[in-house]
From Swiss-Prot:
Name of the featured protein: tRNA-specific 2-thiouridylase MnmA
Protein's organism: Pseudomonas putida (strain GB-1)
TM region positions: none
Family: Belongs to the MnmA/TRMU family.
GO molecular function, one term: tRNA binding
EC number: 2.8.1.13
GO cellular component: cytoplasm
Active site residues per record: C108, C204
Enzyme category, top tier: transferase
Disulfide bridge partners, by residue number: C108-C204
Keywords noted in UniProt: ATP-binding, Cytoplasm, Disulfide bond, Nucleotide-binding, RNA-binding, Transferase, tRNA processing, tRNA-binding
Annotated site location: Interaction with tRNA: H133, Q348
Region Interaction with target base in tRNA, residue ranges: 103-105
Chain residue ranges for the region called Interaction with tRNA: 154-156, 316-317
């Protein structure tokens, strides 16, 4: 099977996902320079119901339109809010309800950007889509591999690990070969409206709101006790869903007799008792794990796990690669690390690599302590 990306650019119609940011803007520009037939598409994935537009959708659409006008391409718009609600947001709420800490960006990429958007673009007659993600692709025979972006500070393969090779084969990543300062310089040189626009941060549908204020609109909080590892009650929490492993801020613990000056950290969430377990010190033994169990595994392309494999992994975005052994056991996928891993968090994603190739990953189900707990 010949990859669609290998066709003559002049005969290849590419629709770029235009977010209103600098990365997608430059992606569209680069594709034009490479000779592709380029159009843009702006996705609206969230319906604001209070008029304040936390997602800045109106401003982002205006920026996307300004860029498309500048470089002379058509901009389509599409509303995927229903798909986002059904396939991303409801799962996000279910995970928080279960006391886990999900990552909606990963689901959004799989279900919206590389499914709903891809299908819609193909229905418009596109041969390929393109996005502003900092990743690369490599065609090897019948397979298309997902590679890390060349800029280690911006590599986004962690967020794309659940996108299949067939979808990657239909996608171009023009800025994956560049570093961020180069991208901004290109945008500035060509007078693009997004050249100096700040990168978006956080979850789109929450925007600048406090996370706890947003979450309590949808989920009832269940207050409970805060305990030390010895079982001493030292405070109250407003709901386990507001806390994550390794968290330091917002615990409301202070001025305890004989407690010392070291800050308190979330060590464990006891879902059965609705108790938040905390301890003092950034290096508290309970913060470290030697292994994890993962579920909901997605591989970019099929891999052979008939015997354990030496790989690297990330348990959070921008973490350096961690050496591990991945094996398929009777209870599921288990990754054993060479070094202790801090704040391994159920609900977050673990992503596996073989060198620069992103193999895929899954959701962290549980972490195994580095040292025995009393």
């Amino acid at each position: 099977m010949t990859s669609p990306a290998l066709k003559d650019p002049a005969k290849t119609r590419v629709i770029v996902g235009m977010s209103g940011g600098v990365d997608s803007s430059v992606s569209a520009l680069l594709l034009i320079e490479q000779g592709y037939q380029v159009e843009g598409l702006f996705m609206k994935n969230w319906e604001e119901d209070d008029g304040t537009e936390y997602c800045t959708a109106r401003e982002d659409l205006a920026d996307a339109q300004a860029v498309c006008d500048r470089i002379g391409i058509k901009l389509h718009t599409a509303n995927f809010a229903a798909e986002y609600w059904d396939n991303v947001f409801e799962h996000f709420l279910e995970e928080y309800k279960a006391g886990r800490t999900p990552n909606p960006d990963i689901l959004c990429n799989r279900e919206i950007k590389f499914k709903a958007f891809l299908d819609y673009a193909l229905s418009l007659g596109a041969d390929l889509i393109a996005t502003g993600h900092y990743v690369r692709r490599r065609d090897t025979g019948d397979l298309t591999e997902l590679l890390k972006g060349l800029d280690p500070n911006k590599d986004q393969s962690y967020f794309l690990h659940a996108v299949g090779g067939k979808e990657i084969a239909r996608t171009l990543f023009p800025v994956g070969e560049l570093e961020k300062p180069e991208v901004r310089a290109i945008a500035e040189k060509h007078g693009l409206a997004t050249a100096k626009k700040k990168d978006s941060t956080g979850i789109c549908f929450i925007g600048e709101r406090r996370f706890s204020d947003f979450l309590k609109q949808y989920l009832p909080a269940q207050p409970g006790d805060i305990e030390t590892t010895e079982g001493e009650v030292i405070g109250r929490h407003h709901g386990l869903m507001y806390h994550t492993i390794g968290q330091r801020q917002g615990l409301g613990i202070g001025g305890l007799k004989d407690a010392g000056d070291e800050p308190w950290y979330v060590l464990h969430k006891d879902l059965t008792r609705n108790v938040l377990v905390v301890g003092q010190g950034n290096e508290h033994p309970w913060l470290f794990s030697r292994a994890l169990l993962a579920s909901e595994i997605f591989w970019v392309n099929p891999i052979d796990l008939s015997s354990p494999r030496q790989l690297t992994a990330k348990v959070r975005y921008r973490q350096s690669d961690q050496q591990c052994t991945l094996e398929l056991t009777e209870t599921g996928y288990r990754a054993v690390f060479d070094e202790p891993q801090r704040a391994v968090t159920p609900g977050q994603s673990v992503v596996f690599y073989d060198g620069e190739v992103c193999l895929g990953g899954g959701v962290i189900e549980a972490a195994e302590p580095w040292s025995p707990r009393a």
